UniProtKB/Swiss-Prot annotation:
Annotated source species: Bacillus subtilis (strain 168)
The protein's name: Putative transport protein YrrI
Compartments where located: Cell membrane
Residue runs in coiled coils: none
GO BP term, example: transmembrane transport
Annotated transmembrane regions: 8-28, 37-57, 77-97, 165-185, 220-240, 243-263, 269-289, 311-331
Topology relative to the membrane: Multi-pass membrane protein
UniProt main location, coarse: membrane
Superkingdom of origin organism: Bacteria
Gene behind the chain: yrrI
């Protein structure tokens, strides 16, 4: 009778001990920071290479299945992918630095414009509580500080990219050999895995791939298309910083449902300092992009690969946003999909035993 409560207490104690160990580990940052630097230098390129290989492998297999020799199909995808990224960086980074620098210099002007708008609002809302006026002023100041810090960090990161050049240069080579020797890597992992875990482990990874693979690849393609369309639209209608706003729009579209509206906030803030026409252009562009994503791109490219109810996805997005902001919202859906597969396999194991 007491066996289950004792086991439960044991697991709780182990979890608390692990959490305490992690906490102490992070508190002693002076000791582990050199090791973290080495780990970061090794594992970040490795993780990026694994992710890129995961994206490119199905396309390579598709070309190989059409009769193209495997080595040639790898080279074609390799050259197209990294050649396209290289060309985009060569053309886009100088423009991006110019636009970021200009935006950073104009932030005080934008703040002055917003202060004028606030003064106008204050004059027409004298009956509002003073606390509400104070909160609006505070929100504007926090927004200004956030954008200033983000832009300065982006400029600094782009200008210091040479510091990470050697690390980044290893990624194309890692990707090539990962895609080329994928079967050898699978066999190695298979033999290194304990025999009792092999069947369940391969089934778990296969289910995760079935759940996430098409979603991730499709979502990234949708984001690329929407980001390009947004950037071109802002450029055609004369909105400043079209490359920055297009990038923000594309990246935030990774977030289901809320992404287009989050990506529209910077464009709206800038458009408000120009004219009502600019605001209308941004609003219309966002609604067109939202319509394209919901009715054309996502149904055909992404489909219902996740097999999760929209309510579950929205709850996951809210939880991710609360825990880690925008990054949490981006990672929330893939993490929930993996947790769903883990839960299914756990329940299956319980029923088998």
């Amino acid at each position: 009778m007491l066996q289950k409560p004792v086991q439960l207490l044991l697991w709780v104690a182990i979890c608390l001990l692990v959490l305490l160990t992690v906490y102490v580990f992070f508190m002693l940052d002076m000791l582990w920071s050199p090791f973290w630097l080495v780990i970061k230098t090794i594992f970040i390129p490795l993780i990026i290479s694994i992710f890129i290989s995961y994206l490119l492998l199905p396309v390579t297999e598709w070309l190989h299945g059409k009769g193209l020799p495997r080595t040639l199909s790898i080279l074609v995808i390799y050259v197209l992918f990294f050649g396209g990224i290289g060309w985009a960086l060569y053309k886009g980074v100088p423009v991006l630095i110019v636009q970021l620098t200009d935006l950073s210099e104009n932030i005080p002007m934008f703040a002055e414009t917003y202060n004028g708008l606030l003064l106008h609002v204050h004059n027409h809302t004298d009956d509002w509580p003073d606390g509400m006026h104070h909160r609006i002023d505070k929100m504007i100041r926090q927004t200004e500080a956030f954008f200033a810090g983000t832009i300065e960090g982006a400029i600094s990161g782009i200008r210091n990219v040479l510091d990470y050049f050697l690390i980044a240069a290893t990624i194309p080579f890692l990707v090539f050999y990962m895609v080329k020797d994928i079967e050898l890597m699978k066999k190695t992992v298979w033999y290194l895995t304990p025999k009792s875990w092999r069947k369940r482990g391969s089934a778990f990874l296969r289910d995760v791939d079935d759940s996430l693979g098409d979603y991730i690849r499709g979502q990234l393609l949708v984001c690329l298309i929407l980001g390009v369309i947004a950037g071109i639209s802002f450029w055609v209608f004369g909105l400043p910083y079209p490359l920055i706003l297009g990038l923000i729009s594309g990246v935030t579209n990774v977030i289901p449902y809320f992404g287009p509206f989050i990506g529209a906030v910077p464009a709206l803030l800038i458009a408000m300092t120009i004219s009502v026409k600019a605001v209308l252009v941004v609003v219309i562009t966002v609604f067109i992009l939202q319509f394209m994503e919901g009715n054309i791109l996502s149904p055909f490219i992404v489909g219902r690969s996740l097999k999760m109810h929209p309510v579950v996805i929205m709850l996951a997005l809210l939880a991710g946003g609360e825990l880690a902001g925008i990054v949490g919202m981006i990672l929330a859906v893939p993490a929930t999909a993996v947790l769903k597969v883990m839960m299914i396999h756990f329940l299956r194991m319980r029923t088998e035993h």
